[in-house]
Each structure stands twice: as structure tokens, then as C-alpha cells.
Amino acid sequence: GPGFNPQWTCSWGPLFRTFEIDYSRDRFLKDGQPFRYISGSIHYSRVPRFYWADRLLKMKMAGLNAIQTYVPWNFHEPHPGHYEFSEDRDVEYFLQLAHKLGLLVILRPGPYICAEWDMGGLPAWLLEKQSIVLRSSDPDYLAAVDRWLGVLLPKMKPLLYQNGGPIITVQVENEYGSYFACDYNYLRFLQTRFRYHLGDDVLLFTTDGAKEEFLRCGTLQGLYATVDFGVGGNITEAFLVQRKAEPKGPLINSEFYTGWLDHWGEQHWTVKTEAVVSSLSDMLARGANVNMYMFMGGTNFAYWNGANTPYAAQPTSYDYDAPLSEAGDLTEKYFAVRKVIQKFEKVPEGIIPPSTPKFAYGKVALRKLKTVEGALNILCSRGSTKSLYPLTFIQVKQYFGFVLYRTTLPEDYGNSTRLSSLPFNGVHDRAYVAIDGVPQGVLERSHVLSLNIQGKAGANLDLLVENMGRVNYGRFINDSKGLVSNMTLGSHILTNWTIFPLDTEEAVRSHLGSWAGCDDKHCAPGPSNYTLPAFYVGNFSIPSEIPDLPQDTFIQFPGWTKGQVWINGFNLGRYWPARGPQMTLFVPKHILTTSAPNNITVLELERAPCGSCGPELCAVELVDQPVIGAPVTHTPRPGSSHLMAEQRGMTDPSGF
């Protein structure tokens, strides 16, 4: 017809997609039209693939037009050159799912991500080079990063918006301005590699705390600078900090905190819905682009949690007091946020997927199977290593979990000799100590640095050392695990260690069921508050004739102390009710079955609720309500999460 211009239709067809910054009007342009994102963070590594679609759809129905996710390098390259991108690690499938639901993606591929994730996503094997300076232009570090980006980024390229995919912007590094190295050559290297793999038209950006000193080392010409801050901060001031770095262009809060992180032994954090609503409305009214961190927090399954310094590990739950709970449930915060978005944008009509039903399967009796020591031949299939002085986890190529250190007492030690890692605080992170199978007590990094023990010359001294999660933020992310210094006993330095890296996962998956009955020869009573680390197993059946089962549930540990739990071989993470605030662990239904009994395996490291010698059973309980905010009696360390919160503009106590 008249005025028909074939070239015009072609360029605006599905083939020609652009996403760019309009500097003259301080906004984004998507396919030439003004655009603003309202986004939420969800980490695919913290939500089972089974639930990705459910969580993403709930985010879409809240009115979000984008999601933001991190790519944890260590989740995908557990050993050098060994890559995992299938099942729960299938990041491409996750991003395609978001695309299918009409959600855009803000991708944060690191290589460092912080995220309260083990070592901020950096693989522990980087530490095999002892002098390595992480997050800098150290050639050893850059070589590993370069190889990784060469694997990851080509997978991301077809998913870029320009190429018909959902990814509109890509973050380079993560809050680099908060790190001591301040190495612009490193940022330049990343910029070059990102451009090489993703092309020149992709929008690259950085994120830093909204203080000028953070943007000094965190920004680079050619990377669009954004800020992050929470509910207590002064929004005008925060965006002025961004304006100093980027006088023109869209205002962006890349991490607007809907809640905050927890540590074992500290109170559970919450942020009031009213505070979230008022800051969110204010930012949206200014035309700002906002990503809510987190919109859906999820779970640190297995050993993936991080830690902060002075050393304090984060718990298994990463609920974050976010609008969607750890189990993906709708909260009042969800509906309040949706209402705010409705004032500014069109929110999808239709039915919001409901919270998933939970089922209380009740008490499950477990019997004690074997102590760790009694199961060494199964747990340590790779064999042990001998060394004059202790080796770290990395030196025996064990990245997660547990290593047993054994030596013999060089002489008789009567009435309480001091076993100690002083002055080095060298137990990273907890050691469960026994002599000839008699439990002695626990050493704990930064908390319990010595222990009185006694024993005869030639007796076995065993320290089972647990890696409780690597530091993920700040200067001390090169966090070695195991015995990282010598141990002294009285005035002797202990030598001639045999070191057993334990393959707990393999043992639990393949052998536990077949282990012969309980071995009670190690039944010497130790101090009443501490018994030998041991495995307990039991099972429960879910009747197949009840429709809709299995359903999600939560496991709690009445009377238990601290340990690790698996259901049907799936590592649910750490429990520590003795410390709190988390008392229950989330159990997603896809790991349960109705066709056979469900196996529960517990590795209790300190003390189970039944005698170590008697035949009586211990029980765990499957309940339908989570408890992640129990009161805490433990004395917290001086201000870790509060200090961090303050740095992120979360200073207004009314927000908590």
C-alpha cells in the first residue's frame, strides 16, 4: 500500500533487535523505544531445575520485566578443565526458560560474584598456586579466567538480545571497588575478553556500593557504572554518586536489598515490607531502573554457602526475607511489591501460581550406622597421604566437605595437655577431636583455639576437619581449608600426619545402604556433650495411593547438634540447631519418591539425641512449616552483617 517501505518493515522485524543507552534522555532504548527494567534476582544455582519455571512465572506475574542472575564459576568447573552444564547446572536452559516467559535477563557472569556463595564463585583449585592474587592481573589468575570465559561466554552469545535472546546487559566482575587490589589492568582485561566473545554492541556494566570511594576502583571507561543500596539509604545521594561516574544515562540500582543475609549464631535478618515499598516507589517515580536483590533467595544446598570475616559462615537457607520465600512461596512482601509495580507498569493479568503445598511426613527413626573412623575404608577410597606437617584441603585436592588428619601421640600425656593451633588460628574451620576413638571435643576457627586432651604414647590422635564454606567477600577470599598451620600438643609440634580426604558424597550415594550393622567397638564414653562423628540412617515411605504426593517438606533435628543431611543421596546442606537461627532445611519434592522408601542419611558431627552405645533410635522430623529465624543464644562476633549492611546503605534500623 501507499507509504509501504519494505526496508523499514524488515529492520523492525524480529531480525533486528537493539538494546542501547540514550544518553541524551537518560534512559534505555529497546528496539528504539524508551525502556526501563524492573527486575528481580534469582540464582539458578540455589533453586532446583524442577522449580525454575514456577519461580520465574511468579516473578513475571509480580510485574517484573527482567531477572538478574549470577553464574558461579565453581558450580560449572569443579575441577580444572572439567565442565558441568547439565541438569541443575544448565544455565542455558534456565535463560531460555526466562526468555520463553517473556522475561529479559541481566547476566552477571563474574568471574567473581560474591553472592554469599563459596569463595564468591571462584573455584577453590585456583589456590593450588599458593601465591595467586585473586581478582587481579596476576598471570596465573588471568590464564584460568581466560579459559573459563572462553567456555562460558560463547554459550551466552546466542542468548544476547541482539541475537534474538533475552540478555540485555552483562555485568563485568562484581563490586570490584570494594576489593583492595584496585587493578585497572584486570578490569581492562575482562572488558577486552567480554567484547571479544560477546561482540561490540552488548551493553557491559559494573556495580558498586553507592559511595564515591567504591566507584573509584570499580569503574572503567566503556563499562556503564551502576550502584547498589538498600532501604535505609538516601536515594538522592546514592544516585548522585552514580551521576558522578555517569553524568548522563539511566539511573540504575543493580541490587536493591529486599532483605539481608544471615550467619550461623546471629539473629535472622528481616527488612520491613513498608520500607521496601517506600524506597521502591521512590526509585520508580524517578524513572530509575531497579533490580531487587533478592526476589527469590533459595537454598545453599550441599556445601555451597559462603562466609564473612571475622570468620562466620552463612547458613543453608538463603531465604533473604525476599518477596518469594526459600520454598518459592508468595509472601505479603510479594503482593506489596506487585502493587507498587502496578502504579508504574502494566502487570500481567491471570492466575498467579500458588505457593506449593507442604506435607508433614512426621517423625523418622534413624539408627547409628558407623562412626566416620569406622567407615574410613569406604570414605577414603582414594587412599591417604603421609606428610611430616599437615597439608591443606587444596594440597590433597579435596575442595569441599571433610578431611581426617591422624597422627600418633609421641609420649604419654596425663591430666589435660593443651592441643592448640595458636598463635595461627590454624583450624579452618572446625575440628572434631578424638584419641583412640575416645571423643575429646571441638576446635573452632576464631572461637575455640585450644582443647585439653589426654592419652598414651602411640595412641591415634584424630582431627576430623570440616570446611564450613569459604569467605566470599573482602580481602580474605583466598581461604585455605583444613589444618593450615602446625598443631602443638603441650610444647611439641605434632608431626608425621596421615591425611584422609573423605569422599562423603560417593559413600552416601553408593555404599551406605550396604554397610554392615552398627559397630559398637568404639563405644567408649567421652565428655557427655560430645560424641564421635557418625552416620545415622533411616527411611520413610510415602503412600502412593494419596494423590498429589510427594509434596515439599522441611526437615528438623530435635536434639541433634550439627551436621550434614542427605535424602535419597541429594545433599540438602548443613544443619546446626545448636547455633541457629535456622532450624529446618527445605526438602524439594522432586528428590522424594513414592515407589520405594526414601533414605535419610545424617552425618552428625557432635552429638545425636540418643546414647552413643545403646540400641535406641534417634529421630528427625519432617514438618510443613519452616523455622529459619529461631532466637539465637550464641554471642555474635562484632558486627559482621551489620557492618556490611551499613556499607550498603542499610543503616536505617526501622528497615529491619
Predicted regions, residues:
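Short, well-ordered coil/turn segments that N-cap beta-strands
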Residues: 36, 63-65, 99-105, 161-168, ...
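Aromatic- and glycine-enriched glycan-recognition loops and surfaces
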Residues: 43-61, 80-99, 273, 414-422, ...
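Extended substrate-binding grooves/exosites of carbohydrate-active enzymes
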Residues: 8-12, 16-50, 57-61, 82, ...
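Aromatic-lined carbohydrate-binding surfaces of glycoside hydrolases
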Residues: 71-80, 88, 101-134, 139, ...
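Aromatic-lined substrate-binding rim segments of carbohydrate-active enzymes
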Residues: 51-118, 191-199
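Gly/Pro-rich turn-and-neighbor structural signature
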Residues: 164-244, 248
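Carbohydrate-binding surfaces of carbohydrate-active enzymes
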Residues: 142-156, 163-172, 177-179, 183-187, ...
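Aromatic-lined ligand-binding clefts that engage carbohydrates, nucleic acids, or primary amines
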Residues: 415-435, 540-568, 575-576, 600-603
